[in-house]
Amino acid sequence: MPQRLICILCLCGFVFAAMPGVWLDVPFIKQEKDGCGAASIAMVMQYWRKQQAKAVDAAADAVEIQRALYSRKDHGIRASDLEHYFQQHGFQTFAFEGKWDDLKQHLEKGRPLIAALKPSSLESSLHFVVVVGIDPAEGVVYLNDAAQRKLLKQDRSSFERQWSAGKHWTLLALPK
């Protein structure tokens, strides 16, 4: 019996070690109407609070973030407001034009990213998602999409098309 258990554990370890992708366990928050930006901020803030073993405070509450930043004119939250909110709450931010390799690099370091997508169903608005995983061998990315679900699997070409329409806008927020 003990030998069998050891074999099973070794086999499981081999299977997990053979997985070429990376995935971060970022909390998922469902968005309110036009609330993808607020939910994305909340997911990333709660992830870092958990990593630092800190209690989640009101600053990481999607409803409060939406109330503070929502623009009726823009039907959501502007990308620059995402950055400012993080900065006001003790985070360093880096907004950049992302590339596929940037996703892998940051995720391997345990850093989730917020990406601006422009799905064809949205005429002029951007849709913010949290990039939580990538599997280059399969050519897929995993998203916490506040409008849909946690760990939404999207093929690279579809993601790149929507990300390109959003000018590859990417936000890295790190606790100070």
Question: What annotation goes with each model-predicted range?
Answer:
Residues C12-F14, F94, S157:
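Short non-domain terminal segments
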Residues I65-L113:
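Mid-length scaffold segments of soluble, non-membrane domains
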